[in-house]
């Protein structure tokens, strides 16, 4: 299994698919499926029957998972999509960094 470069809370850029060119914050990473749920990206309509939780029922909009290969982390310095690397910092901890600018990604 490969390492995941995207974590919950990251700002990501969509590089393929229907929402190509948009950016959003990662709400959840689905490790087993190699997918992530991103705020405002890949929004689908879900038809729900009336139930105790939602007595009205109807159509609700929600974000569907998108594959991690279609996402790039946004560089905190330039605001553009970048690849991610890992290196040891001064304290000896492994941190993620932007390959474009060398800036550490929190």
From Swiss-Prot:
It comes from the Bacteria. GO terms for biological process: translation. GO terms for molecular function: rRNA binding; structural constituent of ribosome. The keyword Heme does not apply. Keywords: Ribonucleoprotein, Ribosomal protein, RNA-binding, rRNA-binding. The keyword rRNA-binding applies. It holds the Pfam family ribosomal_L24. InterPro entries: KOW, Rib_uL2_dom2, Ribosomal_uL24, Ribosomal_uL24_KOW, Translation_prot_SH3-like_sf. SMART domains: KOW (SM00739). One of its GO terms (cellular component) is ribonucleoprotein complex. Belongs to the universal ribosomal protein uL24 family. One of two assembly initiator proteins, it binds directly to the 5'-end of the 23S rRNA, where it nucleates assembly of the 50S subunit. Part of the 50S ribosomal subunit. This is Large ribosomal subunit protein uL24. It comes from Parabacteroides distasonis (strain ATCC 8503 / DSM 20701 / CIP 104284 / JCM 5825 / NCTC 11152). The lineage of its organism: Bacteria, Pseudomonadati, Bacteroidota, Bacteroidia, Bacteroidales.
